[in-house]
């Protein structure tokens, strides 16, 4: 099974994003979602959200923004199949490691994130806040996921 661990801020939006949720939070750009969709289509990968946006699952304050994000992704044909665990004292890479331990069926994965992911440098595709997910990032992720 192939997985894309998805961060949102700095991946699906960038320094030039001018869209906002109904509550006023910086949102996502359609063209960046389409790049993610191209990656998923080319690799038949499953999306697992590792972004702090997942806190909207349990936090009432962020719930509406979270629902708006999921609806936006779905409108582009991007389905989020799961979420990394929230471990209050853990770095994101520890949460991803825990998810991988709980899902041994995952044999290939990439991590799309603008932050450092120290445990998985070979699978980390580091995006830049300035640009978000680029075509080059997508190509690199496809190579990792489709490697035989």
Where do the protein language model's features map onto the residues?
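Catalytic phosphate/metal-binding cores of nucleic-acid and nucleotide-processing enzymes, i.e., regions
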Residues: 1-148
């Amino acid at each position: 099974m192939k997985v894309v661990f998805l961060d949102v801020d700095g991946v699906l939006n960038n320094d030039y994003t001018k869209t906002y949720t109904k509550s006023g939070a910086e949102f996502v750009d359609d063209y960046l979602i389409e790049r993610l969709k191209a990656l998923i289509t080319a690799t038949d990968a499953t999306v697992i959200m590792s972004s702090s946006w997942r806190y909207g699952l349990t936090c009432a304050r962020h719930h509406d923004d979270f629902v708006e994000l999921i609806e936006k992704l779905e409108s582009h044909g991007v389905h989020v199949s799961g979420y990394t665990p929230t471990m209050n004292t853990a770095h994101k890479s520890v949460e991803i490691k825990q998810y991988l331990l709980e899902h041994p069926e995952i044999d290939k994965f990439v991590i799309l994130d603008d932050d450092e992911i120290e445990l998985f440098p070979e699978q980390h595709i580091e995006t830049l806040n300035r640009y978000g997910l680029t075509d080059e990032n997508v190509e690199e992720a496809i190579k990792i996921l489709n490697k035989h």
